[in-house]
Amino acid sequence: MRELVIPTSCTAIDELLGGGLKEGTILLVYGAAGTGKTTLVLQMALNCSGMGHKALFVDCEGDLRAERIRAISGGEPTAVENLTIARPRDFEEQSTIIDSLEQFASAGLAFVAIDTMTGLYRAELSKGVSPFKLNRELNRQAAVMAEVARDYGLAVALTSQVRAKIGKPGQEAGEVEPVANRILRYWADMVICLRHAGQRGLRMAILEKGPSLSGPGPRATRFFRITEGGIV
């Protein structure tokens, strides 16, 4: 049986991923607001559905709109035929969905996107919930996804909000990293950072972790555009 590879519909990012997101792989996408995180993983979910495989989009931000789905899918019925959207209201509900992934995968789920993995986690932090408790639970959720990805070939795409990096010698001003950086990077097989690139609509994708990266040196970088119909 051929390995399932889910394309992003963006040639530049597919190049970074080696053709698309492969089954059994966890991808972390992070970047500031407006860099295209949601659009990227939504395109992957729609492509998976359009290929005839079940896809789940977990909308933790609660701002995914039907109009955006129609614009990206071009109104093609097959693009949404196998797509399910879940909207957890809090971090506990996010945990429940993730704990159900093995059941979903055994029933044919091929791809899950969680947008964002850290939004509801951050909301709990703002309420004064113990960071230790939240970090332990976030790590557990990531471990569950890694196990399901390995055992069932589930392709996973996570997005994360960002925070300013703590200053280090030689660090440029304004550098950011994913919220819960250590946890998410540990479990992710591939990490892509999205950045604004100066021109209107132009964005930059930087591969920070992946099988093709070894040793020090410049990271692979590609440019793409955000349009009404998605990223290209």
What are these regions (language model features)?
Residues I13, V29, I69, L83, ...:
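Conserved RecA-like P-loop NTPase ATPase core
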Residues V148-V232:
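Phosphate-binding/switch region of NTP-binding enzymes
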Residues K22-S100:
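Conserved P-loop
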Residues G19-L21, N47-M51, E76-T78, Q103-A107, ...:
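Conserved catalytic network of the ASCE P-loop NTPase/AAA+ motor domain
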Residues M1-R2:
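Charged, amphipathic alpha-helical linker segments immediately N-terminal to NTP-binding catalytic cores
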Residues D59, R87, T116, H196, ...:
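Flexible glycine-/small-residue-rich
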Residues P88-E93, I98-I183:
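P-loop NTPase motor core
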